[in-house]
Amino acid sequence: MATSSFRGGLAMAVVLLPLLLLLALLAPLQCAAAAATCVGLAPAKRRREVISITEFGGVGDGRTVNTWAFRKAVYRIEHQRRRGGTELRVPAGTWLTGSFNLTSHMTLFLARGAVLKATTDTRRWPLVEPLPSYGRGREMPGARYASFISGNGLRDVVITGDKGVIDGQGEVWWNMWRRRTLQHTRPNLVEFMHSTGIHISNIVLKNSPFWNIHPVYCNNVVVTNMMILAPHDSPNTDGVDPDSSTNVCIEDSYISTGDDLVAIKSGWDEYGIAYGRPSSAITIRRVRGSSPFSGIAIGSEASGGVSDVLVEDCSIFNSGYGIHIKTNVGRGGYIKNVTVDNVRMSGVRVAGVRIAGDAGDHPDAHFSQLAVPTVDAVRITNVWGVGVQQPGSLEGIRSSPFTRICLSNVKLFGWRNGAAWRCRDVRGAALGVRPSPCAELATSFAAAGSCSF
């Protein structure tokens, strides 16, 4: 009887241990909930006028295709502007539609129980030109499919709601990718180009065909209080990808997708170098989630440069990497002034921290071997993890070593002892790091030079 009780208690402990570890990871983040916020960059404005999609013939029965209704509604907002802007309200129901554009000074509001579903008829998706900083579609040469919801050259746009859902119904696109039958690059779920004052909050995004939220060439973008979901085997379903954009705030959100939770980008090889628009002033705060790839990533498409990034109070679990900075010869550009602070991680299958100079593919054979990127001034502090296969891999480029890689109070433990840091072509310092870091990192900040915390 005693043996049976012991076995039962042991089994219960095995079940509860992962939950207890997860609670331990999240507790410090809950305590930080009253910390700073950057949502003031693009607040959710209250509109003076409210109209409903039903006024334009919309039918939320899950069968009627409402593309024309949404396009008529947006046309009305654009061409009969009201002082203070207009809210387009989508009531409870299932609203099937093709892709559509938004306009300036509008709010798209999804009520509780509203589900906006993308059509699975790929013939209904228009093609658009490739991004100039990519030179081609990200997956295929030439044009790309238009994003499900998009805007170009806009100001003051809000997508929000009362936990309404935008469902990209991406399975048809994922299967085309798996079968290698894609003719063009898959559509993003939400994309804004050349826009400012973009606010996305309080809704659920799920099953995106490709990247979920893609602000590109934008300024003053806020993504807050979001839930972004896709199966872990869904290809390239990144959560939020700020791309050649400045003043971006991503806060208080849960993301579980098939690729990086957040990936900061700025163009691809020679096209990104020529376009020359960096990403800068990016804040990622109180984001939780899991991914088969990276929790928080920078790159690998960073040819326009990335700088002034703050990642703090985040929790990453069941992922491939925790923090992942990735670039490659041919990318050019720079990644600098990156601060990562107070990050918790568990169940990391590859490495807790990876900074790599050999990551990512190329758009074509025309990239230059002389376009060598620089990585400088990366500060990683107060990071703690359990179940981390390898604590870290810091591998720079022989002709351009990564400099001022500074670690402080970083403790990443595996399920078994013996895992070690791996370093090459990197310079910096480490204090209070466990397991002990590699010899390439000095044991004092003074010796490393300019490692200031």
Ranges and model annotations:
Residues A2-F453:
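Extracellular/periplasmic carbohydrate-active domains that bind, remodel
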